[in-house]
Swiss-Prot record:
Domain description: Consists of three domains: the N-terminal catalytic domain, the editing domain and the C-terminal anticodon-binding domain.
Record-stated family: Belongs to the class-II aminoacyl-tRNA synthetase family. ProS type 1 subfamily.
Highest taxon, organism lineage: Bacteria
Reactions performed catalytically: tRNA(Pro) + L-proline + ATP = L-prolyl-tRNA(Pro) + AMP + diphosphate
Enzyme class at the top of the EC tree: ligase
Protein name: Proline--tRNA ligase
HAMAP family in alphabetical order: Pro_tRNA_synth_type1
């Protein structure tokens, strides 16, 4: 591409709306332009980079045996209603009506569509396994779009769905996708970590996320410093502390009139917050769920939702519901005598002795409460782990950092096939539901994450495999016919061996051309200037030093960079 013909407009100033590096640099380099909140146009440079990521995904998915197709972005409500998700999905779904008042949505995800296709097209076990994928634009009405394409309302996603006849087949499909994802992110130059995850609204059993560490990430990721354990905070567990060994004392109601919070109660009673248990009440699908965790812990609402079999989001109870369940004011609730449809007790509480909790009477708490003797419930893990706790696998130290999800793989099982009556004829001649897997990659988010990990003060530093262009050939003085002639010859020679090159033949100062090349992140730069009289040009890697090379050696030097990166020229 000759830059004199290219639609490109770089920005020297950082746009006020941009908060993170990828957003700033995608705007400054001319990759994207904002249309509305969370909605962007991809300019030629941005689209070219996006297609590079898509191509890598497509190659690895095809290599893993998946078949590409393209589903409709507009989905009839009946499909979502058949799975039970039309009402459950919530406000993030863009819902539309046609002229006949039929309900549709702009697809935020495509489980129902793929399941319906399998239901109608796959009749026998002899046609299995099948893995279908697409790369398509999704639509989600994010409450607060931010960080550019990291959290937008319109984004490109690769979603794949596997259909197997049994669990063993699903395990194989899942492992193939895991291996493909590792290859995809490695080829993109992205440092992504696979972590245990919750299945969320999509459902299913086993689930793993591919996360990249990021200070502005929307998830907390828990890592062990000693072993490979890694999990999203929604799923993470820690090693349980040893059970307390104390003589069980008689319960004692004590007056705490002005002490509603854990810290206040601990101070008044002169005890550690670790000797208290707090009560949280939720409304889950119309039922009251009481959760009890140690006083210094935070409840994990995702774990609570899973334990409660919630159909959607859970919410704290209203004041009226709180009063009906406890009979007391805020801050004095406890497990003894509470009126709840479901009682969830964190396993840490089970190991505690003689702890303090609310008395379900305003102004009072109870000392020396013990699980089993004084109250019971469903024991489980309902809290967030904290920095420094012991790893549940090896006992090593857990550390927590922010992360951004770029990929997610699920074992859906029969969640959708049973709900939508999607079946095939099994080997025994009977109907059986498909055993499904689901595998997603946020393509636009992956591209932004690459920029987050690969940039410096001058701009983007694209890994060679995903760079929109590999080489920028710069004619320093376009009024010098010899410079333009040699620059054009190098440009054509590079193209002839499969290198994607830019020829900067604009009538601009050399400094402008250099800055544009750097901010766009072009991996290699060839500067054609006054040294041509000696048969030489300047060669520079984006993050390396400039060196003077012979004109006739340029193509071989560029090819050598591809060899170093284990890349083939097309």
């Amino acid at each position: 591409m000759k830059m004199s013909n290219m639609l490109i407009s770089t920005l020297r100033e950082v746009p006020a709306e941009a908060e993170i590096d990828s957003h700033k640099l995608m705007l400054r380099s001319g990759m994207i332009r904002k249309m509305a909140s969370g909605i962007y146009n991809y300019m030629p440079l941005g689209l070219k980079a996006l297609k590079k990521v898509e191509d890598i995904i497509r190659e690895e998915m095809n290599e893993a045996g998946a078949q590409e197709f393209l589903a409709s972005a507009m989905i009839p409500a009946e499909l979502w209603q058949s799975s039970g998700r039309w009402d459950a999905y919530g406000a993030e779904m863009f819902r539309v009506k046609d002229r006949n008042e039929r309900d549709f949505c702009l697809g935020p995800t495509h489980e129902e569509v793929f399941t319906d296709i399998a239901k109608n097209e796959i009749k026998s076990y002899k046609q299995l396994p099948v893995n279908l994928y697409q790369i398509q634009t999704k639509y989600r009405d994010e409450r607060r779009p931010r960080f550019g394409v990291m959290r937008s309302r319109e984004f490109v996603m690769k979603d794949a769905y596997s259909f197997d006849k049994d669990q063993q087949g699903l395990d194989l499909s899942y492992n193939k996708m895991y291996e493909a994802y590792v290859k995809i992110f490695n080829r993109c130059g992205l440092d992504a970590k696979c972590v245990e995850a919750d299945s969320g609204a999509i459902g299913g059993s086993n689930s793993a996320e591919f996360m990249v560490k990021s200070e502005v990430g929307e998830d907390d990721i828990v890592f062990c410093t000693e072993c490979d354990y890694a999990a999203n905070i929604e799923k993470a567990t820690a090693r349980l502390e040893e059970e307390e060994k104390e003589e069980l004392l008689e319960v004692e109601k004590v007056s705490t009139p002005d002490s509603r919070g854990i810290d206040e109660v601990s101070e008044v009673l002169n005890i550690s917050s670790k000797k208290t248990v707090k009560t949280l009440l939720y409304n889950v699908d119309g039922k009251i769920v009481a959760v009890f965790v140690r006083g210094d812990r935070e409840v994990n609402e995702v774990k609570v939702a899973n334990a409660s079999n919630a159909s959607g989001d859970i919410e704290m109870v209203s004041h009226e519901e709180y009063m009906n369940a406890t009979g007391c004011g805020i801050g004095f609730a406890g497990p003894i005598g509470i009126k709840a449809d479901l009682i969830l007790v964190d396993k840490e509480v089970k190991n505690m002795c003689n702890f303090v909790t609310g008395a379900n009477e305003t102004g009072y708490h109870i000392k020396n409460v013990n699980y089993g003797r004084d109250f019971e419930g469903i024991i489980g893990d309902y809290r967030n782990v904290v920095e420094g706790e012991a790893c549940s696998i090896c006992g090593g130290k857990l550390t927590i950092s922010r992360g951004t999800e770029v990929g997610h793989i699920f074992k859906l099982g029969t969640k959708y096939s049973e709900a939508m009556d999607a079946k095939f004829i099994a080997e025994n001649g009977k109907e059986a539901p498909f055993i499904m897997g689901c595998y997603g990659i946020g393509v636009t988010r992956t591209m932004a994450s690459i920029i987050e990990q690969h940039n410096d003060e001058s701009g983007i530093v694209w890994p060679l495999a995903v760079a929109p262009y590999h080489v920028s050939v710069i004619a320093v003085n376009v009024k010098d016919e010899e410079q333009v002639k040699i620059a054009t010859k190098l440009y054509e020679d590079l193209k002839s061996i499969g290198v994607e090159a830019l020829l900067d033949d604009r009538n601009e100062r050399a400094g402008v051309k250099f800055k544009d090349s750097e901010i766009m992140g072009i991996p290699m730069r060839i500067t054609v200037g006054k040294k041509i009289v000696d048969g030489e040009v300047e060669f520079k890697l984006r993050t390396g030093d400039m060196e003077v090379v012979k004109i006739e050696d340029v193509c071989q030097i560029v090819k050598g960079e591809f060899d170093k990166n284990n890349l083939k020229l097309r």
